[in-house]
Amino acid sequence: MNVSLARVDYLVLLVYVVALFFIGFYLDKRKKKANADIFLGGRTLRWWQIGFSLFSANAGPMMLIGFASLGFSQGVVGSSFEWLAWIFLLMLAMFFLPLYLKAGITTIPQFLQLRFGQRSYNFLVIYSLISILVVWLGSALYAGGLIISQVFEWPLMRSIILVAVTAASFTAIGGLKAVVRTGIFQSVIIILSSVILTWLALKKIGGVESLVNAVPADYWTLFRPATDPEYSWVAILAGYPVVAIYYWCADQTIVQKVLAAKDLKEGQYGALFIAGLKIIMPLIFIFPGMMCFVLFKDTVRPDNAYITLVKHLVPHGLLGICIAALIAALMDTVSSGLNSFSTVFTLDVVSRFRVMDDAARRRTGKWVTLAAAALAVGVAYLFSRSGKGFFELSQGLVSILAPPLSVVFLAGVFWKRATSIAAEVVLYGGGLICIATGICHLLNFPGKDFWPHFLLLSVYLFLILAALIVIVTFVSSPAAADGSLVPQATVARPAGRAWPVWLGWTILALVMGGIYSLFH
C-alpha cells in the first residue's frame, strides 16, 4: 500500500535522519570512551533515560503494526500484554536487578556463570547471541523492510539493507549511550505521532461513544472465556508470564538498559517509569486498530490497519512525523539489538581468547556491530523466504526461546537449593526440546490442528522444565559454588529506604486493578 508523501513530509524525514546521526556523532566526539561507556553507557543512566530507552526498544515495528492489527481483529484483549507487564517489571526492579548489580555483571550470561558455573554460562552466551540475532535483529529487519518497501515502494531487500546500515552506523559510533539518547528522541516521536493518529481517528468516528457503539461487544473484553480459540484468559494469564519473565528479566537487550543505571535506585525508578508508560500504550497502539475497524472494516486487512489510518487521515507534514515514528520504532529496536549482540560477543567471547584494553574492546565492539548487522540481513532474507507473516514468526520465536531461560533464572534468583547440574540439564536438554518443538510448530508438523495456542505451548514446556529442574536438583549434590554470588564491582546503593519505590509500585497496582475491573 503506497503512501503518497509531499515535499514537507520528506523534509520531516530528512530532519529526523540528520538528528539521529548528529546524536551518534556528537556522543562519539565528546570524550574518549571506556569499556563501560560503549557497552553500559558509563553506568551513568538516570531513571528517565532508562524508562524512555526501554519504551523505544519495546515499541518496535511489531508493536505499531502488530498491535493495530490485533485491535482491528480482536479488540482490547491485546492490551493484556501491556497491562500485565508491570508485574514482571516489578520483579526485575525489586528482585532481579539488586542481584545483578551486586554481582557487578555486564552481560546476562555472566550471572549464570556466577550462579551455576561455566557450562551454563557457555550455553547462555550462544543462546543469547542466537536470540538477539533472530528475535531482535532478523525479525525487526524483516518487519522494517516490509514497512519501508510498503511505504516507499522499494524492493524488500534494498529496504532491509538500508535499515541495517543506518542503525549499525550510529550504534557503532556512539555505543549504548547513543542508543539510549536516540531512544529518548525516538520515544517522543513515537508517542507524539501515535497520539495524533489516535485523536484524528477518534475525531473521524465521532468520539468515544461512537467507538463504543460501533465495535462488537466482545471487543471491550480484556479476559475472554477459556473456550476462546485465540486469546482465552487461561492462555494469557498462564502463558504470558512464561514469556514475560524471559523478556523483561533475562533478555540481554532489555536488561542491559537497567544494568547501565547510575545506581540501584535509578534502575528501579526506570523500571517503574516504563511500567507506568505501559498504561497508555493500548490507548495509542491498540485503540487505533479498533477505530480502523470501524472506518474500513470491509476494505482493509488487519495487518494494514496502521498504514491505512496514516494514509487516509493524516495531513501532509504530520504524515512525515507518523512515517518517522515507524522508522524510529524500527531503528531503535535494531540498534538496541546490535549493541546487545556487540556487548555479549565482545565481552563474553572475544575477551576469553584475547586480552584487550578499553580501546581494543571499543574497536572490537564496533566491528562486531557491523558484522552482526550483516548477519541479521541474512536472517531477514531467510524470513522473507519462509512464506510466513512477521507477526506469526516473532510470536513463535519468543515462545520457543522463553521456557528454559524463565525456569533457570527463576530458580537461580529465588531457589538457593537449585544445583548447577539441574540448570545444565534444563538449558541444554530443555533448550533442544523447545527448539525442536518450535520448529515443528512453525512448520505445522504433523498438522496445524495438532498444536495448542503458542502461549499454552509455552506453559506446557515451562511446566515440564520446571519439574525437571526440581527433580534433578533433589537427586544431585550441590557443587561448592552453587548459590554463591561474588560481587565484582562496588555498586552505589540508593540513599534511604526502599519504601518510596514500593509505594510507587503499590499505587501502580491499584491503578491497574481499576483498569482490569473496567474492561472485565
Task: List PLM regions with ranges.
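Membrane-embedded helix-loop-helix hairpins and adjacent transmembrane boundary segments
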Residues: 1-520
